Amino acid sequence: NNAGVMLLGPIVGAPVEEWERMIDINVRGLLHCAHAALPHLLEAAEQGPRNVADLVNISSVAGRTANSGSGVYNLTKHGIGAFSESLRQEITRRHVRVGLIEPGAVATELAGHNRPEIREMIGQRFGDMQRMESVDIADAILYMVTRPGHVAVNEILIRPTEQER
């Protein structure tokens, strides 16, 4: 369950439309996808050959921290973590495992949606650090969902080796 935008900048004087866009995509989008998938996952866990099903939500390392200039983004990612844990507790006895992947810097277009001055700030912060690739996140998801049915890996925090926070 992965959809998101990262529109960074100070809270004071921020375009509220950017906040609404992040909340709509990062939170509401994830909620609606989970809601649509859950009946199918519950059925698969009950009737499928593995007797377990997996819902994996993608958050961010930003769901564990808070930084100046990313307050609303942090809010959306913290919310994904809280939702995932609540849902996990709600459906765990029905053999649907809920996992949360929290990636650090990944080489995607995510930062490119920001205003030019913010893109420059992101570039300075991460410099020439080698970012992860999408396949690194896919490997983490694969690990999570291929555990035996009696094992639930509920969270994976994954960062580039050089990423400080």
Language-model features, listed with the residues they occupy:
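Residue(s) in the substrate-gating loop at a strand-loop-helix junction
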Residues: 60
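Active-site helix of classical SDR
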Residues: 34, 76
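A short helix-coil junction within the Rossmann-fold of NAD(P)-dependent oxidoreductases
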Residues: 9, 36-52
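Alpha-helical segment proximal to the catalytic Tyr-Lys
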Residues: 39, 89-92
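Substrate-binding pocket helix/loop in short-chain dehydrogenase/reductase
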Residues: 10-11, 18-23
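Active-site loop immediately N-terminal to the catalytic Tyr-X3-Lys motif
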Residues: 12, 65-71
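C-terminal helical subdomain
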Residues: 100-101, 108, 120-165
